[in-house]
Swiss-Prot record:
It holds the Pfam family DAO. It is found in: Peroxisome matrix; Cytoplasm, Cytosol. This is D-aspartate oxidase. Inhibited by phenylglyoxal; chemical modification of arginine residues in the enzyme with phenylglyoxal leads to the irreversible loss of activity towards dicarboxylic D-amino acids, paralleled by a transient appearance of activity versus monocarboxylic ones. The gene is DDO.
Length: 341
């Protein structure tokens, strides 16, 4: 077989990072990224992009740590290069605070981020309602800059970008030999996955250039994340809610919660509301599937369902998806045994 034709469905952070990894690691392929939505219209564009990972209950901790570390190392290399501004990657220091002492005082990712330590009594004076905290430096990767940066790399490596809505993965047969499904919530339809559901997140993007440290309540519901051109204030976790329109009452409540942690935010200006739907399931779906219809075969690699951990885990899971794609390519390149009559 000559060139193996690969279609990547989805152009959020999963689709684009997987396309870049395949183009670097799987020789002799042509790559086409197909989506009906591109930056700035993806969930990844709304994400705060902080590298503080969630915990997936169905996934071994070592595997989660590997995904996070590979992502952190990839973005840390970018932040230490001339590409940092273009890619929208920065280092940011701050605090994660708790209203009661957690059962796990040191999370699994503590030795991946930089300078992780428990907060001192003096630091905790800033947060009188909280009794315990972590201080550390991590990375922030901003979708509105990072996605175009990835897109540029896909094209630079010879990949194509196609705007098209896919209703059924079989539409891609026989034009493509392998399909990588990075369609997030689209997998309800495209992969018949009833386990995936939206968790609605509403945030405010505000101007408050004096806020330099991130603050995150341990619930993950209230957070203040300073970025390159604005500060992200959050948030919400509304399971099963598909509504993409901002709710003014929720915005008021977010601002009030954030001001309780950082009173100077009362002076924030140019408030903009954003809503994203996190594609959530019990664990990330990262596996091969061979679709069969009559005599036709279509190898698919599924790579979706990261919930709130999309940007924190994306490069590690993209590398794993690429290994699965490589396995599919090897099978296609292995000649079928001739039948002995």
């Amino acid at each position: 077989m000559d060139t193996v034709r690969i279609a990547v469905v989805g152009a959020g952070v999963m689709g684009l990072s997987t396309a870049v990894c395949i183009s670097k690691m799987v020789p002799g392929c042509s790559i086409t990224v197909i989506s009906d939505k591109f930056t700035p219209e993806t969930t990844s564009d709304v994400a705060a992009g902080m590298l503080i990972p969630p915990t997936y209950p169905d996934t071994p901790i070592q595997k989660q740590k590997q995904w996070f570390k590979e992502t952190f190392d990839h973005l840390f290399a970018i932040v230490n290069s001339a590409e940092a501004e273009d890619a929208g990657v920065i280092l940011v220091s701050g605090w994660q605070i708790f209203q009661s002492i957690p059962t796990e005082e040191v999370p699994y990712w503590a030795d991946v981020v930089l300078g992780f330590r428990k907060m001192t009594k003096d630091e905790l004076k800033k947060f009188p309602q909280h009794v315990f905290g972590h201080a550390f430096t991590t990375l922030k990767c901003e979708g509105p800059a990072y996605l175009p940066w990835l897109q540029k790399r896909v094209k630079g490596n010879g990949g194509l970008i196609l705007t098209r809505r896919i209703e059924d993965l079989w539409e891609l047969h026989p034009s493509f030999d392998i399909v990588v499904n990075c369609s997030g919530l689209g997998s309800r339809q495209l992969a018949g996955d009833s386990k995936i559901f939206p968790v609605r997140g509403q945030v405010l993007k505000v101007q408050a250039p004096w806020v330099k440290h991130f603050i995150r309540d341990s619930s993950g519901l209230t957070y203040i994340y300073p970025g390159i051109s604005n500060v992200t204030l959050g948030g919400t976790r509304q399971k099963g809610d598909w509504n993409l329109s901002p709710d003014a009452e929720i915005s008021k409540e977010i601002l009030s919660r954030c001001c309780a942690l950082e009173p100077s935010l009362r002076g924030a200006y140019d408030l903009r509301e954003k809503v994203g739907l996190r594609p959530t399931r019990p664990g990330v779906r990262l596996e091969k599937e061979l679709l069969a219809q009559d005599s036709r075969r279509l190898p698919v690699v599924h790579h979706y369902g990261h919930g709130s951990g999309g940007i924190a885990m994306h490069w590690g899971t993209a590398l794993e998806a690429t290994r699965l794609v490589n396995e599919c390519v090897q099978v296609l390149r292995t000649p079928a045994p001739k039948s002995k009559l």
